[in-house]
From Swiss-Prot:
Entry keywords, A to Z: Ribonucleoprotein, Ribosomal protein, RNA-binding, rRNA-binding
Entries under SUPFAM superfamilies matching the protein: Alpha-L RNA-binding motif
Role played: One of the primary rRNA binding proteins, it binds directly to 16S rRNA where it nucleates assembly of the body of the 30S subunit. With S5 and S12 plays an important role in translational accuracy.
Protein name: Small ribosomal subunit protein uS4
GO terms for MF: rRNA binding; structural constituent of ribosome
């Protein structure tokens, strides 16, 4: 197992949830955290529930750093409308999230690696910033060279995940379009996400 896989599954174990719905997640075998006292789960406090909601969202999107995640919260609150919905939209506009949703990569971690190495084009131009904000109508494509990578082809052919309807994707060409921003109900999370609890956490 690679170090990246180990880190990913460590997140699952620590949070006690199968964040990405993966068959090999250790949570499928036991639903408690790591360590000697992992089975002793108390009923969480309001703060504990808010913290868990934050950790799940941060972890799901590839363990986003605290400073970056706080900036997303601040932007979500600044915008009009429901702050929790705004937060989800901001997260789903990240280029690494879009590449993952389009099934050009099997995990958010692999998506980030693909972008960092310059293998993703946005509107025909190379973008190597995973946090890049994708806009409605933007075209996302895997570079020609990377289309032959085994892990890219395997991800695109996988039947484990469906592509959500706020994206339009040609899986053969490994090219897609960001159609619109999703609401929370549109996003195919394998586990329940509670962005409003995240807003409450930072609003304390």
């Amino acid at each position: 197992m690679s170090k990246r896989q180990e880190a990913k599954y460590k997140i699952d174990r620590r949070l006690g949830v199968n964040l990405w719905g993966r068959a090999k997640s250790p949570v499928n075998k036991r639903e408690y955290g790591p360590g000697q006292h992992g089975q002793r789960r108390k009923k969480p406090s309001d703060y504990g529930m808010q913290l868990m909601a934050k950790q799940k969202l941060k972890g799901y999107y590839g363990n986003i750093g605290e400073k970056q995640f706080r900036r997303l919260y601040q932007e979500a609150v600044r915008r009009k409308g429901d702050s929790g919905e705004n937060l989800i939209q901001l997260l789903e506009r990240r280029l690494d999230a879009v590449v993952y949703r389009m099934k050009f990569a099997a995990t958010p971690f692999a998506s980030r690696q693909l972008i960092n190495h310059g293998h993703i084009l946005v509107n025909g131009r190379r973008v190597n910033i995973p946090s890049y904000t994708v806009k409605d109508g933007d075209s996302i494509e895997v570079r020609s060279k990377a289309k032959q990578f085994a892990f890219v082809m395997e991800a695109a052919a996988s039947g484990e995940r469906d592509i959500p309807d706020y994206l339009s994707v040609d899986s053969q060409a490994l090219k897609g379009t960001y159609v619109r921003a999703p609401g929370l109900a549109d996003v195919p999370y394998p586990v329940q996400m509670e962005p409003n609890l995240v807003i409450e956490f930072y609003s304390r």
